[in-house]
Structure formats: C-alpha cells, structure tokens
C-alpha cells in the first residue's frame, strides 16, 4: 500500500508541475491594432454628386500615398435580378446599398447635429458616412489624417481594428474642398471706419502688407485705403489684425498742389535697391492736380524707412491727363532674376486705346525704363484695368484684370514666366469662372500661396456677379488648386450688398502670412444704412492641406 500511495503521489506531482509549466509558457494572442486594406475596394453610391466623386478620387490618391495600398473605386450598382453579394472587402463611402451602410446611417440619424459623421468597421467593411456631402468629405479627411497618415509607409494598413465605431461632430467655422484643403475663419476685425454710421462717403481700395524685412518689427501689419483727399491713412496692427491704429497720413509733396486721392498700394522692399535698404516701405498711388477740370494725374511713389511712421515723396513713375486720359491703379512687384522693381498700371493716355495695361521697371528707384505694354486689345473700346499679379510655384506669374467694355467687366487671368514678356498684347488670357459658369467682374485681386493642394492655392476676388444676378449679394470668391486652370466658388468671407450705386466690394485685397498658411482678406462692406458709406473689414483665414 505504501508503494502504491507513493507512486500515486509522484504521478500527481508530475501532472501538477506539467500543468503549471504549461500555464507559464502559454502566450495570449496579440491584439491586432492595424487593418490590412490591400484587398479592399472603395465603393460609392451609383448616383452621387460630382463633388463627392472627385473627393473619392483624391481619397484614393492619398490612401496610396500614405499606406501604399492602391485600391480600385467602383459604384454600388448591381443587377437587381440577382442577389446582392456583400461578401467582398470594401470601404463604403456615403449611403451605399450595403446593409452595413444602412445600419450606420440609422446610428448617425440618432444624432441631432447635422454636422456629424460616422466611421465603422465590421468583419469585411469600413463605413465612412456623413449626414451630407460636406460631412462625408470631412469624414474622409478625418480617416486619412487619423488612421492612414499614421502608419508605416507601404504597410498597406490603417490604424483601425474590427469592431471600431465612432461618431464625430464638426464644430469649426470652416470650408473643406474636394482635395481636403480647408479654409477656417479665425478672426474678423474692423481696420477703420467712419466715426458715424450715417456718414456720407466711401472707405475703399484697401491694401495690406505683413512686414518681413524689418527685424524686430517683422509680423507687424500695415494697411492703407482710399478715404478722400486728406492723404492716405496708414493703419498699423501689432497683434496680427485684432486691433488697428492710424500712425500716419501720406501726402504728395513732390507735385506742387496735387492731392493724394486714389488707388494706394503698399509694398516692402525684399532687397536693397539703389539708396533704399531692404525693408523700406513703398506706397504707390495716383495723385491729381486741383484744377477745376482735373487735367493731370500721376503715378507717384512715397517711401518710409521707419515702418510707416513718416514718409517722403520720391518720384513719379508716369504722368498723363485727367479722368479721360490719365494713369491709374499701380501695382509693384520685384523680380529676383532681373533684380528689377516693376510698376504695372492702367494707361488711358494712348489715343489708339480707350485704356491699356502697361509697365515700367527700375533698378535704383530713380530712373525708370521706357513704357511697355502687356495688354492692349485690338478693339480700341475695351478697357483692361486694375492689375494684380501673383507668382506661383510653377514659375508662372498670374495677372488678373477687369475688362471694361464687355458686359459686367469680367475678370481675366493672363500668365507669363517672364515679367518682361507677356506675349501678344492683344491676347488677354482666360476668363476666371467655374465649370458651372460662376464668375464675377470689376475690381479684381489675385494672390497665390503654397498652402493647400499640391499646386498651392490661387485665389481671385472681384466686386459683383457676372451677369448681374437677381440678387443684392456681392461676388463669390474663386479658388484654384491647379494654377488657374479650373476654379471652385465659395461664399464671400466678407458678405456685402450690391446696389445700383453702391461702392461696397470695390477693390478687395488678398495677402498672406510669410509661410502662406494665413490669408488676410480685406474688403469694404456697408457701414450703417443703404447708400450711406462703407468701412474696411479684415478676415483672417487659416489654410491647411493634407500635408500641412
């Protein structure tokens, strides 16, 4: 009995030890935190908007860029005489006919906020769905940024696991485009306004610069505008546009008896030119004599070497006649390759043309080149005018101008890679309009920033819709992500009304922060009562693209 008991005890001990050893060496299964999407297909509803179709195309492109997974896109159409096969691995975008899309839509419907979207993962589906096209677009961007951009390159995975489900609500004051570039309004402020809302007169034609070549003063904002014959007000902001104060009033002390009236333009020298150092502030504007018939106008330059506090009148770029044959609307731009400062402007003085676009250049701010044409139409009755020029990363300059003489004074863009060669002067480029025909006319401004899409962002603004619509709303803002080949329209960030004799929206202005991520947009909406006066408002818009 003793031997049998001992043997039994030994066998029990061995069993217990073996069991203990098995417990010590057994490993728990590793929880999957990524999902292989290499075998998935992107599926969209068979009937959907062109905007969502374009957005899905960009979604596919970014998925490939971030994960290395090259997925096909197909619609959810199927032969209704056959049973719908839902066994495939799919990324479902929008309200598809798949069962899991319907289930996700029910969950989303339970939320009261219209700015919501859902992302849900089942065994073989990923659902990305918003309550409308805008929120679906935001859901796709959210998916890319949070789950695709965060994985290893060429992993062909996303940072999601089966069973994941989340509902998000969008709260920011922003616009999102089909390429996922986003415009978010971050500030509205008044630059300057008449003392009374019942005043008679106009505050218009604002321009602005952010100092970049003035050492400790860099980042300061300076602005000017038209506000009568008392001189050009110089407004300053040291808190990036939140508050403003007037620091100077610029008058013409070169042309005896002339008044500073119209079309001021601010510019900061990016390099030394002649006797003037990098960081010198230049104001170019149109002066006129005080004679009763107003028979002389000039393009005159003023300089400040102390960040806009005091000014000196230094030269006339050109001089011509009065209202019917004068010189107007100067625009300055420096070209590194030629080391020239160019002054573009509108010229009424040629009897062969009602108006044409011309320029001169200087290398010392004392002497100027002979006058050269960039747009002079074959039809002498046409009046191209109000130049602004933006340099883009493809090496092209885009020049926007109005074409008075065509109904509504539509806006055109003409391009060149050389400021001294605009091709045939009778060629006035292409009209600025969307594929749907949305466009505008009069008082244009254009500018370009590297922020946004792969080609950066070209923005063009103007005064009124073309043709004049049955509305009192001002012009849209047009955006291009392909160097001005195509445009999309958004509501004007500074809403204003258009009346028969209103000056609202006359010559809006676009400029950017040094890194291009902040758009400073200025315009003159109505201040007070209809037909009374306008004030200058600033809107700051943060621009972010997928790779910003």
Where are the predicted features?
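Bacterial N-terminal signal peptides
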Residues: 10-18
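Asp-box/BNR beta-propeller blade signature and adjacent active/binding-site loops
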Residues: 177-548
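Sec-dependent signal peptide cleavage junction
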Residues: 17-33
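Solvent-exposed alpha-helical segments and adjacent loops
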Residues: 29-178
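Bacterial N-terminal signal peptides that target proteins for export
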Residues: 1-10
């Amino acid at each position: 009995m003793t031997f049998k008991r001992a043997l039994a005890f030994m066998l029990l001990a061995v069993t217990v030890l073996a069991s203990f050893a098995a417990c010590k060496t057994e490993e728990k299964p590793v929880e999957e935190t990524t999902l292989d999407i290499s075998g998935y297909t992107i599926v969209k509803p068979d009937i959907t908007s062109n905007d969502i179709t374009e957005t899905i195309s960009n979604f596919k492109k970014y998925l490939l860029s971030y994960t290395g997974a090259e997925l096909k896109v197909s619609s959810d159409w199927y032969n209704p005489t056959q049973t719908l096969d839902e066994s495939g691995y799919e990324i479902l975008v929008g309200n598809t006919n798949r069962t899991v899309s319907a289930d996700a839509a029910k969950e989303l419907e339970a939320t009261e906020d219209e700015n919501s979207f859902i992302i849900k993962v089942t065994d073989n589906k990923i659902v990305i769905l918003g309550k409308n096209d805008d929120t679906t677009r935001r859901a796709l961007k959210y998916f890319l940024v949070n789950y695709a951009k965060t994985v290893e390159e060429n992993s062909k995975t996303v940072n999601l696991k089966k069973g994941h489900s989340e509902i998000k609500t969008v709260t920011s004051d922003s616009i999102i485009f089909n390429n996922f570039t986003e415009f978010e309004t971050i500030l509205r402020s008044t630059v300057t306004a008449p003392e009374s809302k019942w005043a008679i007169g106009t505050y218009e034609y604002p321009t602005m610069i952010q100092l970049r070549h003035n050492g400790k003063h860099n980042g300061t904002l300076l602005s000017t505008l038209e506000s009568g014959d008392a001189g050009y007000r110089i407004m300053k902001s040291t808190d990036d546009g939140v508050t403003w104060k007037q620091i100077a009033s610029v008058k013409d002390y070169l042309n005896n008896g002339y008044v500073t009236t119209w079309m001021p333009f601010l510019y900061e020298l990016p390099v030394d030119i002649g006797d003037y150092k990098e960081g010198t502030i230049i104001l170019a504007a149109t002066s006129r004599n005080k004679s009763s018939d107003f028979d002389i106008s000039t393009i005159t330059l003023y300089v400040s070497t102390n960040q806009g506090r005091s000014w000196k009148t230094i030269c006339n770029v050109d001089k011509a006649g009065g209202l019917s044959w004068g010189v107007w609307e100067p625009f300055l731009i420096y070209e590194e390759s030629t080391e020239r400062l160019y002054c573009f402007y509108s010229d009424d003085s040629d009897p062969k043309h009602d108006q044409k676009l011309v320029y001169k250049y200087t290398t010392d701010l004392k002497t100027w080149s002979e006058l050269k044409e960039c747009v002079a139409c074959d039809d002498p009755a046409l009046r191209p005018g109000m130049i602004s020029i933006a340099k883009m990363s493809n090496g092209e300059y885009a020049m926007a101008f109005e074409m008075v003489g065509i109904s509504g004074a539509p806006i055109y863009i003409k391009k060149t890679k050389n400021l001294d060669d605009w091709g045939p002067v009778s060629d006035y480029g292409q009209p600025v309009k969307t594929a749907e025909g949305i466009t505008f006319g009069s008082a244009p401004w254009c500018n370009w920033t590297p922020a946004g899409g792969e080609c950066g962002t070209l923005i063009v603004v103007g005064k009124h819709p073309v043709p004049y619509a049955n509305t009192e709303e001002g012009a849209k803002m047009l955006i291009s992500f392909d160097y001005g080949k195509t445009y999309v329209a958004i509501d004007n960030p500074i809403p204003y009304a258009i009346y028969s004799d209103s000056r609202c929206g006359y010559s809006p202005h676009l400029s950017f922060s040094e890194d291009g991520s902040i758009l400073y947009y200025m315009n003159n909406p109505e201040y007070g009562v209809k037909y009374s006066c306008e004030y200058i408002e600033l809107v700051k818009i943060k621009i972010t693209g997928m790779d910003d």
